Amino acid sequence: MKKDIHPKYDFITANCSCGNAIKIRSTVGHDLNLDVCGQCHPFYTGKQRDVATGGRVDRFNKRFSIPGAK
């Protein structure tokens, strides 16, 4: 078998913007900076917002709706 064909698999630190530091193993070779993690992501913290962007149909109906009608 060939020797030294696999990349190094070392411990690195993934630092989140909230201050959380996570020790993980990776082949990247340097520490990572994360925007969100499990402690600050809105889905996991329960502070999720309902973003209703609406589509083209909603925008059309809003623009051309008759005032006083349903």
UniProtKB/Swiss-Prot annotation:
GO terms for biological process: translation. Keywords: Metal-binding, Ribonucleoprotein, Ribosomal protein, RNA-binding, rRNA-binding, Zinc. One of its GO terms (cellular component) is ribonucleoprotein complex. This is Large ribosomal subunit protein bL31. GO terms for molecular function: metal ion binding; rRNA binding; structural constituent of ribosome. Part of the 50S ribosomal subunit. Pfam families: Ribosomal_L31 (PF01197). Binds the 23S rRNA. InterPro entries: Ribosomal_bL28/bL31-like_sf (IPR034704), Ribosomal_bL31 (IPR002150), Ribosomal_bL31_A (IPR027491), Ribosomal_bL31_sf (IPR042105). Binds 1 zinc ion per subunit. It comes from Enterobacter sp. (strain 638).
